[in-house]
Amino acid sequence: MKVKTITRGTSLTRLNDQDPVKRNLDPSLHPFERAREYTRALNATKMDRMFAAPFLGQLGRGHQDGVYSLARDTKTLIDCASGSGDGAVKLWDASERCERWTSKAHEGIVRGLVFSNQGDVLSCASDRYVYMLNKQDGKVKRSYLGDSSLLDIDTSKGGDLFATSGENVSIWDYSRDTPVTKFEWGADTLPVVKFNYTETSVLASAGMDRSIVIYDLRTSSPLTKLITKLRTNSISWNPMEAFNFVAGSEDHNLYMYDMRNLKRALHVYKDHVSAVMSVDFSPTGQEFVSGSYDKTIRIYNVREGHSRDVYHTKRMQRVTAVKFSMDAQYIFSGSDDSNVRLWRARASSRASIRSTREENRLKYLDSLRERYKHIPEIRRIARHRHLPTNVKKAAEIKREEINSLKRREENIRRHSKKGAVPYEKERERHVVGIQK
């Protein structure tokens, strides 16, 4: 009699290998596939909220005064600098959450911080000085004297240039003691200046006169001036889409603009209940983070008008500065309670090493959550957040005010001649005018 046996080669398997599972993917054999996937998506959403723990801790023992500026080193993942109201600049090691050095360089509030292309720290303050601090020990390598109080600073990624803003926008060369070029358009103060990451000769500034001005170093002249309804407090360029930038406004919203067409905003981002003080793009260009006067930090997807997450703590006060880390996994925040805090960009993510099976499982659950995110139950769980009482109450009052204004406008339109009260588009409402 002939007996058939199953044999396996010992060289093809290992002791801890998982037995392969044979699956037939024919849909007719899986009539309950959709129900199973919905259950998995629901459980994955619940587990995601259950493991959400965004706050990692504060860096060191903080400052002696409020933190008003932050900078990240674009060549490393762990270096972050902060400037405070007492004129001190500190360099932090994010991996150890400790302080490397402190430099008491300035006599006034450190308004602007940035890392130079060589890795040194550039700081500016209301005492009119710009100091280049050695990254290794914090000692002053070089100083520059401006014409007036300096409110912001940024470096060009394409050369040895940096820009400062105050009464005007000044372009400096590292090797010169005086500005190479000065830009002026109007007579008001300019608290914000930012270089484009990709088009390195283009920069933007925001003024106290509610203006946003685009400059081009190749023509040594301003290009366009946008006038908005309320003042812009912060600007950040998209590192992946060279023409787009987001602006944080005093009207609690953020606006995405295309520098080629400033007649309307590309997107309007809502949810804050007080002025937006700082905004910064993720290195991926898909998300950005904002810090507000309402003591919260919000993370936005560039294609969604509402925040995907909101961070807050009981002790954190008004957020004055936020920055993404260069790997887009962490967020630095500075507030006027003198602390620099470290957050996860994904509240439920962990930095531990994952096996291939675990990585594939997480990707599968992410795809299920994305597929079923519009189901009411899953959407409710994914969107639910606990907010401070004052923020929740302010949001309710703001919602009632907006609905009241809408009803009033609709009543006026209903009792007026047809076409006398035109509809005002949301993306054009914030724009007052454009000058060239």
From Swiss-Prot:
List, as start-end ranges, the regions of compositional bias called Basic and acidic residues: 423-436
Q: What is its main location?
A: nucleus
Compartments, as annotated in UniProt: Nucleus, Nucleolus; Cytoplasm, Cytoskeleton, Spindle
An example Gene Ontology biological process: maturation of SSU-rRNA from tricistronic rRNA transcript (SSU-rRNA, 5.8S rRNA, LSU-rRNA)
Going by the entry's taxonomy, the superkingdom of the source organism is recorded as: Eukaryota
Where is the region Disordered?
411-436
Sequence ranges of the WD repeats: 62-102, 105-143, 145-175, 176-225, 227-267, 271-310, 314-353
Keywords, in A-Z order:
Cytoplasm, Cytoskeleton, Nucleus, Repeat, WD repeat
Q: Does the keyword Nucleus apply?
A: yes
One GO cellular component term of this record is: nucleolus
Signal peptide bounds:
none
Name of the protein in its database record: Protein sof1
Q: Which organism is it from?
A: Schizosaccharomyces pombe (strain 972 / ATCC 24843)
